[in-house]
Amino acid sequence: QENGYQTAIIGKWHLGTTPTGFDYSKVLINWGGQGTYFNPQFCINGKDTVTEIKRHCTQVIEDDCIDWLVNRDTTKPFMLMYQFKAPHRDWRPDSIYHDLFSDFDFPEPETFNDDYFGRLAASENMMEIENHLNRRDMKLIAPTGLSRRDSMRWLAYGDKGQFWTPYDSLNGVALKKWKYQKYIKDYLRCIRGVDRGVGRVLDYLEENGLAENTLVVYTSDQGFYLGEHGWFDKRWMYEESFKMPFLIKCPDLIKAGTVSKELVMNIDFGPTLLDFAGIKVPQNIQGKSFKNIFSDSSYIGRDAVYYHYYEFPIWHKVQPHYGMKTSKYKLIHFYYSMDEWELYDLETDPNEVNNIYNKVPGSLILSLKEQLKSLQSEYKD
């Protein structure tokens, strides 16, 4: 904004503060900032005025972003943060996608029936598709005649591992498989709506001669479990939630189809965007630009990335843990109500089911721990 860009954020914010640095902001505010899939509420430009629009949340955000692009000041460069609620829990797709994927079943992931052997923290989880998806997640309808409070309790049944089934004849393995299909199909139906919204913006850029000179980034705040390890949700340092999508399009500077396996962190996103815009990166910003990762074959990225999760026990009983990933290894320490270390060789065990912490030379453990301590010192954690 200080460098002449017209700036806007539309959609999910979820930080508990009013956005600053934007010429225009319209962010979700109900359900703790997550927003709801239907009848979402927004705060516009930090004012008390709340707008409720009776359409699907993805469609509202999509339409508002197109409107902003059409009506912006075209004499200025722009920066737009276009942020969807979908596919956050409880995965309620737009009605136009209700029948999508209804004619086939998705294959279950390789680790769908993981027994968590050798991984104490994982074995204590409360995010299993089999045991912890509730009635609301599966789109069941509460019985009539219940109070609002009792209706909410009825829908939440299953969160704590309580057994329930939609049909008396559906149980055991068949019930687990049924829950998975309902979950994955609703998740991907929500994603289809996001795909539509992203496509509309890309089409707008093409139709208005902006595609060649606009940097487009598609990313997320984390990955997600789609049945891997038998789970839904996120939080763990295991690959499926630890890794984030990061696709970038800038025809003038990046050759289509370029793929990099260099390690980067989300704190690098800001400096990278500033670098692409030709803006000096402030000294007090953590992270570093990886702009040259796409154009310089000699670019050397990070040799390790750091992670720390500390919320417990409210969210799915995921133990607080910190750790480090290199190109070959991942070292994790669960430290709150247990003292457990895990080490994975990502080259031979990409699914992270074989904890080798007690099976490798002590010299390797010592070296990795020293590297981990160095990262903690760097980030003052």
How does the language model describe each region?
Residues 1-14, 52-54, 58-61, 67-68:
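Long, well-ordered early-domain segments
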Residues 1-9, 19-20, 24-45, 377:
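Active-site segment of extracytoplasmic enzymes that catalyze sulfate/phosphate-ester chemistry
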Residues 21-24, 29-33, 50, 90, ...:
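C-terminal cap/loop subdomain of S1 sulfatases and analogous C-terminal strand-loop tails that border
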